[in-house]
Amino acid sequence: MPSCTTPTYGVSTQLESQSSESPSRSSVMTPTSLDGDNSPRKRFPIIDNVPADRWPSTRRDGWSSVRAPPPARLTLSTNNRHIMSPISSAYSQTPNSLLSPAMFNPKSRSIFSPTLPATPMSYGKSSMDKSLFSPTATEPIEVEATVEYLADLVKEKKHLTLFPHMFSNVERLLDDEIGRVRVALFQTEFPRVELPEPAGDMISITEKIYVPKNEYPDYNFVGRILGPRGMTAKQLEQDTGCKIMVRGKGSMRDKSKESAHRGKANWEHLEDDLHVLVQCEDTENRVHIKLQAALEQVKKLLIPAPEGTDELKRKQLMELAIINGTYRPMKSPNPARVMTAVPLLSPTPLRSSGPVLMSPTPGSGLPSTTFGGSILSPTLTASNLLGSNVFDYSLLSPSMFDSFSSLQLASDLTFPKYPTTTSFVNSFPGLFTSASSFANQTNTNVSPSGASPSASSVNNTSF
């Protein structure tokens, strides 16, 4: 009969099963003194074997190929290891980027490094393929170009002027975005011409086009050609490759400065009539083509468009309003909200020839059970109404307005939409009075039975 005794697995059993040629694992892992070394320090014995970088590394499906760094207490500094050495000793071949202190210091964070993966401790297969900040991982976000968006950008740029030379990168990004949105919204499509290959010497030619100021004395040709802040003229110069300048009488906005410069050197053009000067510099086979294209576009701008059909003027005015910060987007009114005129409560009692007499008893005109009998007599003076604590904030509940709307004051009367709570309270002050104030006011306002109401108990109050 086999014995049911559990075999003992002790140290003696393991030592007997080992051969004499191979040392035991306990003897390899136990620090021993070296021969001829009197130093009390202990170290592992060095046994030459296959280098650790040639060991086949096991790869698990779904795990990253970069091994996790070992704990500091298990890392060995020697390069020669025994085959029975701890597994953690093979981690000395880990790249330096994974063992750097900045990698595991929570106070320092690396945004992007070519040798450092963006997700070093992730366990996905594609963690080493691309970085979170690589061009393949992120795509540029295009915002829809609208007039409201451009107005917000210009407003933010004006706010940045309060902090000069502090947000240079933000200002540069804002300028680029403003230019992109402006081109998408207000860029005038000037046709481009096909030019031959440059050949010959560089020459410069100039042409002058007079503005029909006498035929259209009230038309603003200068503003139409230049545009807001000179944007239209700059765009025309960029598309045609020619320089566009407005010269002559009336070309300067400041008339006093124009009269002061008239007759001086380099200001001879002020003696001439208002005109547009087009200048082009290029090779002989290209300069005339570019100049002719620029002259055609300027002549089109000098033809006034009928009122209300000038699309270029509309864009220029809208762009100017955005630059000046005076642009207001057109919003359609909300038809669901109707503004009703509500009379406000007068702070002083109104004087009238005859008093308004109403029943002083509570609940005679309106049912008192709706608001707990807190309806006041309309004969209450305005001074007492404003001076006492007549507003009960406990009544401001969602069911209050529903209860009030349920009161059928008239068959064809609908509950109006009050714009504010104050207008509602001022319209119906009797509904916002506590029971204590109602009792005090009842004692002072109600006259004894059989006696005529006195002048002190009846006041003229308009609701």
Curated annotation (Swiss-Prot):
Pfam families given in the database record: KH-I_KHDC4-BBP, STAR_dimer
Region annotated Qua2 domain, chain positions: 305-336
Site note Involved in RNA binding, residues: 220, 243, 247, 313, 316
Reported impact of residue 314 to K: 1.2-fold decrease in RNA binding affinity. 11-fold decrease in RNA binding affinity. 1.3-fold decrease in RNA binding affinity
Composition skew (Polar residues), residue ranges: 1-10
Site (Important for the interaction between KH and Qua2 domains): 228, 320
UniProtKB keywords: Developmental protein, Differentiation, Meiosis, Oogenesis, Phosphoprotein, RNA-binding, Translation regulation
Superkingdom of the source species: Eukaryota
Effect of residue 39 to A: May abolish phosphorylation by cdk-2. Increased expression in the gonad mitotic zone and reduction in the size of the mitotic region
UniProt note on tissues of expression: Expressed in proximal and distal oocytes in female worms but is eliminated from proximal oocytes following mating.
BP GO annotations: meiotic cell cycle; negative regulation of gene expression; negative regulation of nuclear-transcribed mRNA catabolic process, nonsense-mediated decay; negative regulation of translation; oocyte fate determination; oogenesis; positive regulation of female gonad development; positive regulation of oocyte development
Effect of residue 150 to A: Moderate decrease in monomer stability
Cellular component per GO, a single term: cytoplasm
Entry-linked SUPFAM superfamilies: Eukaryotic type KH-domain (KH-domain type I)
Site annotation Important for RNA binding: residues: 253
Domain KH, first and last residues per copy: 208-260
Mutagenesis / variant outcome for changing residue 313 to R: 11-fold decrease in RNA binding affinity
Changes after translation: Phosphorylated by cdk-2 which may negatively regulate its expression in distal mitotic germline cells. Undergoes proteasomal degradation in proximal oocytes following mating.
Effect of residue 156 to A: No effect on homodimer stability
Domain remark from Swiss-Prot or TrEMBL: The KH domain and the Qua2 region are involved in RNA binding.
Function field: RNA-binding protein which recognizes the 5'-UACUCAU-3' RNA consensus sequence. Binds sequences in both the 5'coding and the 3'-UTR region of rme-2 mRNA. Binds sequences in the 3'-UTR region of cye-1 mRNA. Binds to cyb-2.1, cyb-2.2 and cyb-3 mRNA. Binds sequences in the 3'-UTR region of tra-2 mRNA. Binds to the 3' UTR of Notch receptor homolog glp-1, thereby repressing glp-1 translation in the embryo. Binding to the glp-1 3' UTR is inhibited by pos-1 binding to an overlapping binding site in the glp-1 3' UTR. Germ line-specific tumor suppressor essential for oogenesis.
Known partners and oligomeric status: Homodimer.
Name of this protein: Female germline-specific tumor suppressor gld-1
Organism of this sequence: Caenorhabditis elegans
Gene name for this UniProt entry: gld-1
